[in-house]
């Protein structure tokens, strides 16, 4: 059992006590043990964090872009040096397998910081002549203070995804991690400070989203909100941001993504991709391809191939090197996923494997749900329509391309989509018809720093990562210059 000291807030370059006098517990989902008590920020603490950010941002923005770039690159070096230490803490807090957090979470998050550190010096405006005596130019200026609100499935990675472009562009960020997985955001803040980021440029406030999130979205000093989470909460955040001071928003929300297997696909490759698209990170990935469309002629063979692979999944202690499937991140979430599984059974889906909680030995103490595969699924089933955010695959048979495209697009979500086919032209044709912002052909799930990430429809607004994101952390100032005489009409 690991017990950490009481976790504080991080404001103006140091850990500080919250003034609310309240705390909440963060729990190890593999064991049910309490890891730490975490202090809850009061509204006065949030105000202190915002004012600190406003002060720090002026110092940060006054630095040259090259100075900011060097500091962010130093943060990357520290992140990579402490990869294993941070991964251990992330596994403790989230339940994700250590084999995953050591190779993905910190590594890919640091990649994003490194990517934007390189772009910090490339933020530029334009200059155009209007006539011989006049021209105009544009400047891209930082927004000022922005807020990031993180989700519980990739805590430190999301904190880096949100802070990296914001800081590279000269902004300061007040970040609120999920209260389910609150531990690593403060470690990131300390690393930024150690690297040379001025006090106040990255502050961390803890507590329930319904309070802290509202205070951030309504604060008049904050110019932008970057939110990752569910659709219903995202709509509230967006409405609050608009009604308070017309803040800009980036929303990375939910998904119910289709994975289309074509009849010419290699069966083994298709099954491998489907299993990765559903069970990586115990199924807790917003882009997961949980609606797997399979040609009716391939259905039996595909089902057998998927079940064979699911049986090879190694469920266990997430700290064990051999484990590649840990518990869900919280016990309440486990109960929610189990309710969805029961609804699948009740609505007539055919259970191929899994279908309940893992209760063997020590697993009974944790929030473990067995990798679950349903077939004979219909588009009107609850498990097919709603985001489960857990290890539940729904297999749906189809007969032709037009049908599968229509059914794949028949959703309010539009986050991700994938196609598996040996015919590249066919794969591109189908992908271009699918209504989704992140798409993969003959693979699934990779999100490199260079690739914009975001959804269509109710899956989001704006993008994270990629070159275009950097521009959304700046605003354009246009300046006209007249070198000649000025003639008034009056």
From Swiss-Prot:
<dbReference type="InterPro" id="IPR016163">
    <property type="entry name" value="Ald_DH_C"/>
</dbReference>
<feature type="active site" description="Proton acceptor">
    <location>
        <position position="252"/>
    </location>
</feature>
<keyword id="KW-0479">Metal-binding</keyword>
<feature type="binding site">
    <location>
        <position position="93"/>
    </location>
    <ligand>
        <name>K(+) 1</name>
    </ligand>
</feature>
<dbReference type="InterPro" id="IPR016162">
    <property type="entry name" value="Ald_DH_N"/>
</dbReference>
<feature type="binding site">
    <location>
        <position position="246"/>
    </location>
    <ligand>
        <name>K(+) 2</name>
    </ligand>
</feature>
<feature type="binding site">
    <location>
        <position position="180"/>
    </location>
    <ligand>
        <name>K(+) 1</name>
    </ligand>
</feature>
<dbReference type="InterPro" id="IPR011264">
    <property type="entry name" value="BADH"/>
</dbReference>
<comment type="subunit">
    <text>Dimer of dimers.</text>
</comment>
<dbReference type="GO" id="GO:0046872">
    <property type="term" value="F:metal ion binding"/>
</dbReference>
<feature type="active site" description="Charge relay system">
    <location>
        <position position="162"/>
    </location>
</feature>
<feature type="modified residue" description="Cysteine sulfenic acid (-SOH)">
    <location>
        <position position="286"/>
    </location>
</feature>
<dbReference type="GO" id="GO:0008802">
    <property type="term" value="F:betaine-aldehyde dehydrogenase (NAD+) activity"/>
</dbReference>
<keyword id="KW-0520">NAD</keyword>
<feature type="site" description="Seems to be a necessary countercharge to the potassium cations">
    <location>
        <position position="248"/>
    </location>
</feature>
<protein>
    <recommendedName>
        <fullName>Betaine aldehyde dehydrogenase</fullName>
        <ecNumber>1.2.1.8</ecNumber>
    </recommendedName>
</protein>
<feature type="binding site">
    <location>
        <position position="254"/>
    </location>
    <ligand>
        <name>NAD(+)</name>
    </ligand>
</feature>
<feature type="binding site">
    <location>
        <begin position="150"/>
        <end position="152"/>
    </location>
    <ligand>
        <name>NAD(+)</name>
    </ligand>
</feature>
<comment type="function">
    <text>Involved in the biosynthesis of the osmoprotectant glycine betaine. Catalyzes the irreversible oxidation of betaine aldehyde to the corresponding acid.</text>
</comment>
<dbReference type="GO" id="GO:0019285">
    <property type="term" value="P:glycine betaine biosynthetic process from choline"/>
</dbReference>
<dbReference type="InterPro" id="IPR029510">
    <property type="entry name" value="Ald_DH_CS_GLU"/>
</dbReference>
<comment type="pathway">
    <text>Amine and polyamine biosynthesis; betaine biosynthesis via choline pathway; betaine from betaine aldehyde: step 1/1.</text>
</comment>
<keyword id="KW-0558">Oxidation</keyword>
<dbReference type="InterPro" id="IPR016160">
    <property type="entry name" value="Ald_DH_CS_CYS"/>
</dbReference>
<feature type="binding site">
    <location>
        <position position="387"/>
    </location>
    <ligand>
        <name>NAD(+)</name>
    </ligand>
</feature>
<feature type="binding site">
    <location>
        <position position="26"/>
    </location>
    <ligand>
        <name>K(+) 1</name>
    </ligand>
</feature>
<keyword id="KW-0630">Potassium</keyword>
<feature type="active site" description="Charge relay system">
    <location>
        <position position="464"/>
    </location>
</feature>
<dbReference type="InterPro" id="IPR015590">
    <property type="entry name" value="Aldehyde_DH_dom"/>
</dbReference>
<dbReference type="InterPro" id="IPR016161">
    <property type="entry name" value="Ald_DH/histidinol_DH"/>
</dbReference>
<feature type="binding site">
    <location>
        <position position="460"/>
    </location>
    <ligand>
        <name>K(+) 2</name>
    </ligand>
</feature>
<feature type="active site" description="Nucleophile">
    <location>
        <position position="286"/>
    </location>
</feature>
<keyword id="KW-0560">Oxidoreductase</keyword>
<dbReference type="Pfam" id="PF00171">
    <property type="entry name" value="Aldedh"/>
</dbReference>
<feature type="binding site">
    <location>
        <position position="457"/>
    </location>
    <ligand>
        <name>K(+) 2</name>
    </ligand>
</feature>
<feature type="binding site" description="covalent">
    <location>
        <position position="286"/>
    </location>
    <ligand>
        <name>NAD(+)</name>
    </ligand>
</feature>
<keyword id="KW-0521">NADP</keyword>
<feature type="binding site">
    <location>
        <begin position="176"/>
        <end position="179"/>
    </location>
    <ligand>
        <name>NAD(+)</name>
    </ligand>
</feature>
<feature type="binding site">
    <location>
        <begin position="230"/>
        <end position="233"/>
    </location>
    <ligand>
        <name>NAD(+)</name>
    </ligand>
</feature>
<comment type="similarity">
    <text>Belongs to the aldehyde dehydrogenase family.</text>
</comment>
């Amino acid at each position: 059992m690991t017990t950490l000291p009481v976790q504080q807030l991080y404001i103006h370059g140091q850990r500080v006590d919250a003034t609310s006098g309240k705390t909440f517990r963060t729990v190890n989902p593999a064991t049910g043990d309490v890891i730490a008590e975490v202090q809850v920020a009061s509204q006065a603490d949030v105000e202190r964090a915002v004012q600190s950010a406003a002060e720090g941002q002026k110092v940060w923005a006054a630095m040259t872009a090259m100075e900011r770039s060097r500091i962010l690159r130093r943060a990357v070096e520290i992140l990579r040096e402490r990869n294993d230490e941070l991964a251990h803490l992330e596994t403790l807090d989230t339940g994700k397998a250590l084999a995953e957090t050591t190779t993905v979470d910190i590594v890919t998050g640091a990649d994003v910081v490194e990517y934007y550190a390189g772009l910090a010096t490339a933020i530029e405006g334009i200059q155009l002549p209007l006539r011989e005596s006049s021209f105009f130019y544009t400047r891209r200026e930082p927004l000022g203070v922005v807020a990031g609100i993180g989700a519980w499935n990739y805590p430190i990675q999301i904190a880096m995804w949100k802070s990296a472009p914001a800081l590279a562009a000269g902004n300061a960020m007040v970040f609120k991690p999920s209260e389910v997985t609150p531990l690593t955001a403060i470690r990131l803040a300390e690393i930024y400070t150690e690297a040379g980021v001025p006090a106040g440029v990255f502050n961390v406030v803890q507590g329930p989203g319904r309070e802290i999130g509202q205070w951030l979205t309504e604060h008049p000093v904050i110019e932008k909100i970057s939110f990752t989470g569910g659709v219903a909460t995202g709509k509230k955040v967006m409405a609050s941001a608009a009604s308070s001071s017309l803040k800009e928003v980036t929303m990375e929300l939910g998904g119910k993504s289709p994975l289309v297997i074509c009849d010419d696909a290699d069966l083994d490759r298709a099954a491998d991709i489907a299993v990765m698209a559903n069970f990586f990170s115990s199924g807790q990935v917003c882009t997961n391809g949980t609606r797997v469309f399979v040609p009716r002629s391939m259905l039996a063979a595909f089902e057998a191939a998927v079940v064979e692979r699911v049986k090879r999944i190694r469920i266990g202690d997430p700290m064990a090197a051999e484990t590649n499937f840990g518990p869900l991140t919280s016990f309440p979430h486990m109960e929610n996923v189990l309710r969805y599984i029961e609804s699948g059974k009740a609505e007539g889906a055919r259970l191929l494997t899994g279908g309940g909680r893992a209760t063997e030995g020590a697993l009974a103490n944790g929030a473990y749900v067995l990798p679950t595969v349903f077939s004979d699924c219909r588009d009107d089933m609850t498990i097919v329509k709603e985001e489960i955010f857990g290890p539940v695959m729904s297999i749906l048979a189809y007969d032709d391309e037009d049908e599968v495209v229509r059914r794949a697009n028949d959703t309010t979500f539009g986050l991700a989509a994938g196609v598996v086919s040996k015919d590249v032209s066919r794969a591109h044709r189908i992908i271009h018809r699918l209504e989704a912002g992140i798409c993969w052909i003959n693979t699934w799930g990779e999100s490199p720093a260079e690739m914009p990430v975001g959804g269509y429809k109710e899956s989001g607004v704006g993008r994270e990562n990629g070159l275009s994101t950097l521009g959304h952390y700046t605003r354009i100032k246009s300046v006209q210059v007249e070198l000649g005489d000025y003639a008034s009409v009056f």
